[in-house]
């Protein structure tokens, strides 16, 4: 039984992360390229869920609950690859978050949200614009 516990724990965490399918994004929300809008309409309902990037134990040491996102993203090296930066202010093409959201085979890990369905390109474009605007903490 004790040998199965780590396997069961891993399976439950990974299955929980598969629920970041974008279904929590308010369909009529006017998503703006600001951290406040992205937090309320993308990170909180889609990413900051227990077992993924919310709560006490977060995947890849990335905490995306309100009040934590900015300090965990902008200018922060990835725990999966220290030569990769989660958000490079002003440079969405070199920001790992964009690679993780757009690519089926990102430089490290898997495409997010884990297991899909994935965010619509229009939502990712708003995140790109926020980063291109300097990724301000607003």
Residue locations for each model-derived region?
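C-terminal motif of bacterial Sec signal peptides marking the signal peptidase cleavage site
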Residues: 13-16
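Solvent-exposed helix-loop boundary motif
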Residues: 19-31, 36-121, 125
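Flexible coil segments in periplasmic/lumen-exposed cytochrome c-class electron-transfer proteins
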Residues: 121, 133-138
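Sec-dependent signal peptide recognition
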Residues: 1-10
